[in-house]
A protein has these predicted regions:
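Short beta-strand->alpha-helix linker/helix-N-cap micro-motif
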Residues: 30-95, 101, 105-107
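A flexible loop/linker signature enriched in serine peptidases of the S9 family
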Residues: 158, 169-176, 192-195, 212-221, ...
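Amphipathic beta-strand/beta-sheet edge segments enriched in Tyr/Trp
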Residues: 26-27, 85-149
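Short loop/turn segments that connect beta-strands within beta-propeller blades
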Residues: 122, 181-185, 225-229, 270-274, ...
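Residue-level detector of Asp-centered blade-edge/turn motifs that repeat once per structural unit
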Residues: 159-161, 204-205, 249-250, 293-294, ...
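Blade-level signature of beta-propeller repeat domains, shared across WD40, Kelch, NHL, RCC1
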Residues: 394-429
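Hydrophobic beta-strand positions that form the internal "hydrophobic ladder"
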Residues: 165, 206-209, 251-255, 295-299, ...
Length: 429
């Protein structure tokens, strides 16, 4: 595996050991605070023995990628390197810079070493340093590992620039599943059924993708090993609906909607498709389950009250309680990996928007998306700080992303066709 060739054990540089205080003493940025200003960061072009500081050809592409990764997290403003020529000896205070990422690289044969240091301009001291070794063709991956480690220095949580998003696109004329990283690199087609595909869902380890396809005329459930894209297995081909797989936190089971016995209901199945338990029953439609991170509860959608609403079920008692009471319909709930919030889409005043709620307090509902179009199918970033969703309007459906409170809403991918059903997962080493 290529990533295994990178020495991902981060090397703390010698100078850091002496000057960086113990992590317990660190004070991290709260990027969720409404009144927090963006951190201003400069990213000079990478230097190397063969490419002096300020050399645009060798060092600029890596600095540009690092800048893109840092800015993606929503709380960093990267200074345009043209303002200081990409050099690492500018007057940072005059430029209003808070921090500088000083980076360099060195090649030896087919190998490469990348090193980055974080300078606190106000304190005039180095906060941290990281070094990565790998093959030259892995330079982008190493740069993004550096990015995610710098984000961790700011927030206490590793960054997500290497995380991945699955989505459905009709760019080829048929709706198929694609996967790309969060920065829009490496879009690749996963399915080739040449028929409608919906509801892609990553396994917790990020190695498998479950989805539903209509290519046989029935809505069947499939599982693809992303490490070997040609390895696809049918999990459930039961007559009727086999829809919306929701992986358990341990990755051993899924909750799916099956209509084999009449009304669409939630069933617990194993990875081979064997039914372990039926979770709902009755005349109502029950769909779109999402597990709590601790595996003790699920949220799901049911029309048992007459319209689609979000419900919470305790998996031990099987008791279900209604969570949503406003809006014509509420659907597609998804539980934050932190466990504190669920996001869902709600139809109000003729328009779909994304809302969040603390499931322990149904009155805590907040609208987080805004503006034109219908916003649907929310999915959480692996760190629980951002939400991606499908936005329909202006003649097209695309994937957008925002901070969990609705700030920094922007287009995620600008690719051919219409995109829907986003699903976010962590990076895989």
């Amino acid at each position: 595996m290529n990533n295994m060739r990178i020495l991902i054990a981060i090397v703390l540089l010698a100078f850091c050991i002496a000057i960086v205080p113990a992590r317990a003493e660190r004070v991290y940025l709260d990027i969720t605070a409404q009144d927090v200003r963006k951190v201003v960061v400069a990213v000079p072009w990478f230097s190397s023995p063969s490419a002096p500081a300020g050399d645009e050809k060798e060092g600029k592409p890596m600095a540009d990628l690092l800048s893109q990764g840092l800015a993606f997290h929503g709380f960093i403003q990267v200074v345009d390197s043209q303002k200081y020529g990409g050099r690492n000896d500018a007057d940072w205070k005059a430029l209003g810079v808070d921090y500088v990422v000083m980076s360099k690289f060195e090649t030896a044969g087919s190998g490469m070493t990348i090193e980055g240091r974080l300078l606190d301009v106000r304190e005039d001291k180095m906060m941290a340093g990281r070094r990565y070794r790998g093959e030259s063709k892995q330079s982008e991956d190493m740069v993004l590992r550096l990015c995610d480690s710098m984000i961790e220095e700011f927030t206490g949580t590793p960054g997500i620039s290497r995380s991945r998003v699955a989505y459905v696109s009709d760019g080829t004329g048929r709706k198929e599943v694609y996967v790309a990283d969060a920065l829009g690199r490496g879009h690749r087609q996963v399915t080739k059924h040449q028929h409608l595909v919906v509801s892609p869902r990553f396994s917790p380890d990020g190695n498998y993708l479950a989805y539903s396809s209509y290519h046989t005329g029935n809505q069947n459930l499939y599982l693809t090993d992303l490490r070997q894209s040609k390895v696809t297995n049918a999990v459930s081909r039961r007559k009727g609906m086999n829809l919306a797989p929701a992986w358990s936190p341990d990755g051993k089971t899924m909750i799916v909607t099956l209509s084999k016995d009449g009304s669409p209901d939630l069933y617990l199945i194993d990875r081979e498709g064997q039914v372990k338990e039926r979770l709902t029953s009755g005349a109502a439609i029950n769909v779109s389950a999402s597990w709590s991170p601790d595996g003790n509860s699920i949220v799901f959608v049911s029309d048992r009250s007459g319209t689609p609403q979000v419900y919470l079920m305790d998996l031990k008692s099987r008791n279900a309680q209604r969570l949503t009471f406003e809006g014509k319909e509420n659907s597609e709930p998804t539980w934050s990996p932190k466990g504190d919030l669920i996001a869902f889409s709600s139809l109000r005043n003729g328009q779909y928007h994304i809302y969040t709620m603390n499931p322990a307090n149904p009155k805590s509902v907040q609208q987080v998306s805004s503006g034109w179009g219908d916003c649907e199918a929310p999915t959480w970033s692996p760190d629980g700080k951002q939400i991606a969703f499908s936005r329909r309007g202006q003649g097209k459906k695309q994937i957008w992303v925002m901070l969990k409170d609705g700030r920094e809403m922007r287009l995620l991918y600008n690719v051919k066709g219409n995109q829907s059903y986003p699903q976010w997962t962590k990076a895989v080493d």
